[in-house]
Amino acid sequence: MIGLGTIVNVGTVLIGTTIGILLKNGLPKRFEKTVMQGLGLTTCFIGIGGTLSEVLTIQNGEIGTQHTMLLILCLALGAVIGEALNIEQRLEDFGAFCQSHFAAKGDSRFVEGFVTASLLFCVGAMAIVGALNDGLNGDPTMLIAKAILDGVASILFAASLGKGVYLSIVPIFFYQGGITLMARFIRPWLTDVLIGQMSCVGSVLIFAISLNLIFNSKLRVGNLLPAIFLPVLFFFLARFFPTLGTL
């Protein structure tokens, strides 16, 4: 069944968030900071590992790099597009709208929970590659594995950030579901290299999210989201400008 992985993912986040909300009521305030930092450290290593797996190469016993210029161009151009569209502010506005209608009074971290969880659950390599596998091959295995991880993460997020994590199922459904459906139409042009490049950019964004979690910084990761899909643009442009294919 096409899209099964995304449906399972939505279900595990709903269950995990519910468990986290129940735990939140009995979780001392001093635990929250440590829980978030622990989740941030885990996220950090996931992001670094995903990036290095695509950037580093080993040939004839020597370590080299690949796709570094492409990565720089995607992030720079993606930032320009994202800032022009003001994606993160739109996410926050949507979260604030839902907070005003559905959140309990005093739930001051509702928007933060929605934005942080949505970005983490959507920008990673597993979301991209898993959704593509589901669409191309009808294989939801990777998305189901991601669903389990997201379920655990949603427990921790909800325990610290509250009910806003529930709302992350909306971007999960449309983002992963959209990639799955899109994969059916762009199947002839997708290559392992292209998928790897998209995953690499996504892993860098995961690392950026980890900095927000650990240091409570304000990197606007949402405005970098277009960067994930720019390797597709460079792939098609390389047909007319072969030099781009060497980035």
Which residues does each predicted region cover?
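Helix-loop-helix junctions within the multi-pass membrane cores of secondary transporters/permeases
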Residues: Q99, S108-R187
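Structural signature of hydrophobic alpha-helical transmembrane segments
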Residues: I2-I15, Q66-L73, G135-A147, L190-V204, ...
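Juxtamembrane boundary at the C-terminal end of a transmembrane helix
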Residues: F235-L247
